[in-house]
Amino acid sequence: MIKGSSLKRIKSLVMMAIFSVSIITTAIVSSAADQIPFPYNATYPYGAYSCLADSQSSANNLLKSEWEQWKSAHITSNGARGYKRVQRDASTNYDTVSEGLGYGMLLAVYFGEQQLFDDLYRYVKVFLNSNGLMSWRIDANGNIMGQNAIGAATDADEDIAVSLVFAHKKWGTSGGFNYQTEAKNYINNIYNKMVEPGTYVLKPGDMWGGSDVTNPSYFAPAWYRIFADFTGNSGWINVANKCYEIADKARNSNTGLVPDWCTANGTPASGQGYDFYYDAIRYQWRTAIDYSWYGTAKAKTHCDAISNFFKNIGYPNIKDGYTLSGSQISANHTATFVSCAAAAAMTGTDATYAKNIYNECVKVKDTGNYTYFGNTLRMMILLYTTGNFPNLYSYSSQPQQGLKGDVNNDGAIDALDIAALKKAILTQSTSNINLTNADMNNDGNIDAIDFAQLKVKLLN
C-alpha cells in the first residue's frame, strides 16, 4: 500500500516531468504504422560503444532539435515538381544532387517521417535515367544540369536503395509505395549497372569507372550484406569483400588513410585526387557501421587505424584534408572531418577519446554558404554515435519484458535500482545503467516519470 505522502511525492514528480517534457520535446511527424519508432536507444551487436553521449535522453532531444534545423535548411518544395527535394546551399545556388536524396531518405526513415520519405522518393523517380537510377545533379528549378549530369552516382543510389529496404521494414505496405518491390528493383539496377562484371569492383557511376577508377568513400559493405539477404543475390557479398581488398591495397600502412579515388589495385587513378580529402573522409563512417552491425574484423582494423591517426593529432586540431602519409593540406576544422572522425571512434576502446570527439562533433556545426555537406554527415553521425542508427533490416524495438526496473542489470529489482536511477537522472549520465530496463514507460527518455513508475513498482 502506498502512503499518502509517498503518493503525493510521486504525483509531484510525474507532473514536473510532464511539464518539462512538454517544453523541451520537438514534434516529429511520424507514421501511425511505424513498427520501429524513433528514438531507438539501441545497443549495437558489436563494439564497445553504442551511445557516446553522457545522457541518452539529452542526446535524443538534441537529435530532434537538430533534425528540425536540418530540414528547415535543406528540405524544400521549391523546384521539386510538386514533391520535396534536398537542396544544397548558397555555394551551389541551392541545387540538388542525388547524394542528398540518399542522405535525406535515410534521415527521413530513421526519424520516422513517412510522408517526407515518400515525397523525396517521388522526386527521385522523376529523375530516374534509362538505367533506372537517379541522374546525379538537378538545378533549383528542376532541370538536369547538362548531359554529364544524366548519369548516376553510386553512393547516392545505394543509400536510396537501403532506405527503401528500411522503409519496408518500418512501414510495411502502408504509404504510397510498395517499398519491398521498389527496393528490389533499385538494388538489382545498381548491381547490373554499378558493379563491374567479373571483378565485383564497385563502379562510381552507372556510365563510367570500374577497375580503372573507383571511390573508397562509396564502399558501403553493411548495405551490401543487407542487399544480399534481401534479394538473395550472394554476389553482393563478393562486392563487400572486393571493397576491403581494394582498401587494403590503397590505405597507407602507417596512417590507415585511404584516397579519394584509386584503381582496383589501390594506385592513383588517372585524373583523380589521391589524398584523404572530402570524399575519402566518409570511408570510416560507412566502414564503422559494418563493424557495429556485423562485427567485420577488417572494418575494425581500418577504422581503428584512422581513429588513432586523429587521436594522435588531437581532436581540436583535426583539419579538412591530409596526404595519405599524414601531412596536413587544409587549415579548416569543419563538421565534415570532425563528425567522420567521431564515427571512426565507434570501433575503438578509448572511451575518453571517443567521448571527446563525440562532444566535438556536437560542438562543430558549419555556418555560412557551405553548410550542406558537413552538417548532413554530422546529422547522420549524431544518430550513429548515440545508438540511434541500428540496422533497421534486422532490428527489433520490442523491450525485454520482465527486466523493467532492473536499472543496474543485476537480475533483481530493488532499492539499488532506485538509487542507480536517481543518480542517473541527477547527474544526467546514463552510462552505468541499462537503458531499456530504466525506461519504464518506453518513451525513449530517462526522467522523473520513470523514477516515479519504478517507485510504484517497488511499493506494490
From Swiss-Prot:
InterPro entries registered for this protein in UniProt: 6-hairpin_glycosidase_sf, 6hp_glycosidase-like_sf, Dockerin_1_rpt, Dockerin_dom, Dockerin_dom_sf, EF_Hand_1_Ca_BS, Glyco_hydro_8, Glyco_hydro_8_CS
Reaction catalysed by this enzyme: Endohydrolysis of (1->4)-beta-D-glucosidic linkages in cellulose, lichenin and cereal beta-D-glucans
Keywords linked to the UniProt accession: Carbohydrate metabolism, Cellulose degradation, Glycosidase, Hydrolase, Polysaccharide degradation, Signal
Domain of life: Bacteria
Domain annotation Dockerin: ranges: 400-460
EC number of the protein: 3.2.1.4
Gene3D superfamilies xrefs: 1.50.10.10, Dockerin domain
Active site positions, chain numbering: E99, D155
Signal peptide stretch: 1-32
Gene Ontology BP annotations: cellulose catabolic process
Example of a GO MF term: cellulase activity
EC category: hydrolase
UniProt family annotation: Belongs to the glycosyl hydrolase 8 (cellulase D) family.
Name of this protein: Endoglucanase 2
Species the sequence originates in: Ruminiclostridium josui
Source lineage: Bacteria, Bacillati, Bacillota, Clostridia, Eubacteriales
